[in-house]
């Protein structure tokens, strides 16, 4: 910052930092959230200097809150889902992405599940979400098919973890392990931003598009507030076009 401004540390002003912020955003293409983080660390540094009486005031405090762009987090498209399915090299991986999509569970919830938690006949299961709040969720026929195939291949018993590592001694899969597996799957399928939470967003969007009331989607996802559900769900462009054709 000092090199860019060509100033000593005790002469930097809030206006200087706003100029620095504008330059980094427009010329360097740095995201606003990244600049917010940088200014947070700079503010802590200047607070230290004020405490040590090396400078009189903290110029970062005069910058104010940066306006952050609201990033629209998109669900997987139908084509992307098919590419992901076609790129699975193992039954476990196919079972996992079908499970994530079908149930809409958080990845932390999935890693806590055991085989006995699945009521395969009813295609149901109970998960324990935030605050140990339980909710019931469901398996599609496709998810049931691949999950049964995967568990049979493993000869899995009731007390075993639902998803395990491929290497012996086949330990329970962790959140980082699942995230890594999905990143690799995304690379093979050429689908960017392939991570567990995106499957949750996708099923929520698809359920709404098919007519499920948003209050029911809220319960399905285990949200406390309806506002949270609204953030998770996006409307696909083709839906807008179809509605326009119908109502315009």
Describe every region a protein language model picked out.
Residues 1-248:
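Conserved catalytic core of the tyrosine transesterase superfamily
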